[in-house]
């Protein structure tokens, strides 16, 4: 692997990579979630609160239609989103009444996806990168073991999507929210630690940073990190945009920047 030279190696994956036959279901579900992002936030909160009451192995969920968050606020799941999860095969036996909601996760892997707010953007980017057939290799949720040579234990040892493009590592961080300086810094450190100069960093974030040329966007640019935002994610051409961003990323101009 390209990581070995710097004393880091791929330890494996934090999330199971989806089977190819599930790609279509996942992308259809992404459409629903990304188009209703605020409802997905509350629904995701609800699912997490309720799932926490049951063991990790438990596939069946039953609850009152309202759950109470730590801050005392009540959350109710969005019916449209729950029905979509059932339609695309992530949950089954969905029953919603005025007071209660119950369903089964279709499999342990489906449960991992449904209870995770941000994983859908990672899956979305991963599937589009795979489908483009433009790259040598694509990994989802690559866990990187810094301990190989390094005494300092990095907290951020997971990179959402890693792509090998003609043996150049491309690190992609996915945030289902606006980009922020912390996200840029984190990606920059990871990129520098593993890839050095000969690597690329891309932040895919669900904000308006690229359109509005925000401070975060400008900071990222300064460090040679590309940002794709909600407009790109919601575009029918996301796959082409992703490939173009990776292939055309200008490495030469980065070399002389002081980091």
Regions found by a protein language model. Name each.
Residues 1-259:
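Intrinsically disordered, low-complexity Ser/Thr/Pro/Gly-rich regulatory segments
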């Amino acid at each position: 692997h390209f990581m070995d030279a710097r004393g880091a190696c791929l330890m494996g994956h934090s999330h199971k990579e989806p089977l190819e036959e599930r790609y279509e279901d996942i992308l259809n579900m992404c459409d629903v979630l990304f188009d209703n992002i605020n409802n997905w936030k509350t629904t995701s909160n609800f699912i997490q609160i309720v799932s926490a009451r049951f063991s990790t192995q438990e596939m069946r969920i039953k609850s009152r239609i309202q759950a109470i968050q730590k801050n005392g606020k009540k959350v109710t799941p969005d019916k449209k989103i729950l029905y979509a999860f059932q339609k695309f095969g992530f949950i089954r036996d969905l029953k919603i009444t005025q007071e209660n909601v119950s369903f089964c996760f279709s499999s342990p892997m489906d449960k991992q996806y449904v209870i995770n707010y941000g994983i859908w953007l990672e899956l979305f980017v991963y599937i589009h990168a795979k489908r483009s057939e433009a790259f040598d290799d694509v990994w989802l949720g690559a866990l990187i073991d810094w301990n190989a040579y390094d005494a300092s234990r990095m907290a951020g040892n997971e990179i959402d999507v890693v792509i090998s493009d003609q043996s150049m590592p491309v690190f992609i961080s996915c945030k289902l929210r606006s980009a922020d300086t912390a996200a840029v810094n984190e990606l920059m450190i990871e990129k520098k630690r593993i890839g050095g100069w000969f690597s690329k960093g891309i932040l895919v974030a669900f904000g308006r940073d690229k359109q509005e040329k925000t401070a975060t966007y400008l900071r990222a640019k300064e460090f040679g990190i590309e940002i794709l935002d909600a407009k790109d994610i919601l575009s029918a051409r996301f796959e082409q945009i992703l490939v173009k961003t990776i292939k055309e990323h200008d490495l030469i101009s980065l070399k002389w920047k002081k980091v």
